[in-house]
Amino acid sequence: MTKKHLTETRFADLALHPKIQQAISSAGFEYCTPIQALSLPVALSNRDVAGQAQTGTGKTLAFLLATFNRLMQNESSEKTESGPRALIMAPTRELAIQIAHDADALIEHCGLKMGVIYGGEGYEGQKEQLAAQPDILVGTTGRLIDFYKQDLFSLKDIEVVVLDEADRMFDLGFIDDIRYLLQKMPDPSKRLNLLFSATLSYRVQELAYEHMNAPTKLEVEPLQKTATRVTEELFYPSKPEKFPLLLTLIEEDWPDKAIVFANTKHGCEKVHGWLVANEHRAGLLTGDVPQKKRLRILEDFAEGKLDFLVATDVAARGLHIPEVTHVYNFDLPDDCEDYVHRIGRTGRAGASGAAISLACEEYVYNLPAIEDYIGHTIPVTKYDGDALLSDLRRPRPIQRRRRHNSGGGKGKPRGRRSGPPRNAS
């Protein structure tokens, strides 16, 4: 979240614990984002929240502040079990890690302990976290249930429960796990329940009313599905021209930090191969990439060691990557909601961004549903096929292994074009 003045609501005017106010002040935050301004007064009065908000709107800080405040206000609560006082559930391990990272300043000032539990990593280090009896536990449902069934922690002392990106948990099939964990906790009336979702669909609302205590439904600009600061652009390439067009647009835009989406793992591998072959610093993020390598790729991308991240929707969902300037939809997504999630990676918290989509003959049929969902047509840009980059290096054939390499070299792409491709007659 940036330090921009996004609403008239100041953190200093909210009923937050003094140590939390110190943490906010030290981080340089003064004004709330819209979702924070709506949800915090409700949550700080110990009322449940079901909030609709995209990633990048400041919702993570909103539920972290509410969680820490509840625990700090009830410091005298005596734990009767070897379990946490708050549980934050996330759909992906990357999101769980990011949530814990975002809580660092609060942990430093408040003195509460946090543990992070997720799959894809060894058990021993996470068991040590549980042995330290954290006040707040962040995790993915599968590993949480695994450790719970081993009696490594209890849920009987839960005072706050957070469901982040609830819609994605449905998409990934985690809803039964969520219900299992919620049923092991105290009654909803005895805890603070916070749910955040990019969409408050019927099934998400059903979950909220089933396991929450009369939640207040909050929506941030529900009719504005795409960010107003994101410039959208659509091209109609033929299949053979998709890679040359993508690489030409990248050279023309020369983005500081960009994410390229493809619909399949193999599609991502091909895009990544073309980028690396033409000397772009790119990382590949699919479900097959081992966890430690995923974290290294994300760290390199965040630190500017990589300029491009090539990803599938499932692999990228829930990631909090700041300062993404461009999103390229190499394929138009099959799910119209994924289009919104993709382009929502840029233009966050007051910044501007660009979303460029390629509608080839294979995926162009997804366009009507996308435009109907977002409520507007995407501006079309014509291009001159003769102006595309020539003499591009073709990637080496992909070797089918259980693990795929990612990364890239430095430098500019080869084969200068004769002129700009955009707005050609």
Curated annotation (Swiss-Prot):
InterPro entries for the chain: DEAD/DEAH_box_helicase_dom (IPR011545), DEAD_box_RNA_helicase (IPR050079), Helicase_ATP-bd (IPR014001), Helicase_C-like (IPR001650), P-loop_NTPase (IPR027417), RNA-helicase_DEAD-box_CS (IPR000629), RNA_helicase_ATP-dep_RhlB (IPR023554), RNA_helicase_DEAD_Q_motif (IPR014014)
UniProt superkingdom: Bacteria
Entry keyword set: ATP-binding, Cytoplasm, Helicase, Hydrolase, Nucleotide-binding, RNA-binding
One cellular component term from this protein's GO annotations in UniProt: cytosol
Domain Helicase C-terminal as annotated: residue spans: 242-389
Compositionally biased region (Basic residues): 395-419
Principal place of residence: cytoplasm
Entry binding sites for ATP: 53-60
Motif (DEAD box): 164-167
Short sequence motif named Q motif, residue ranges: 9-37
Domain annotation Helicase ATP-binding: ranges: 40-218
Region of interest: Disordered: 391-425
MF (Gene Ontology): ATP binding; ATP hydrolysis activity; RNA binding; RNA helicase activity
Reactions it catalyzes: ATP + H2O = ADP + phosphate + H(+)
Gene Ontology annotations of biological process type: RNA catabolic process
Enzyme Commission numbers on file: 3.6.4.13
Localization per Swiss-Prot or TrEMBL: Cytoplasm
Assembly and interaction partners: Component of the RNA degradosome, which is a multiprotein complex involved in RNA processing and mRNA degradation.
Function: DEAD-box RNA helicase involved in RNA degradation. Has RNA-dependent ATPase activity and unwinds double-stranded RNA.
UniProt xrefs under HAMAP family: DEAD_helicase_RhlB
Protein family according to the UniProt entry: Belongs to the DEAD box helicase family. RhlB subfamily.
Stored PANTHER family: ATP-DEPENDENT RNA HELICASE RHLB, ATP-DEPENDENT RNA HELICASE RHLE-RELATED
Protein name, per record: ATP-dependent RNA helicase RhlB
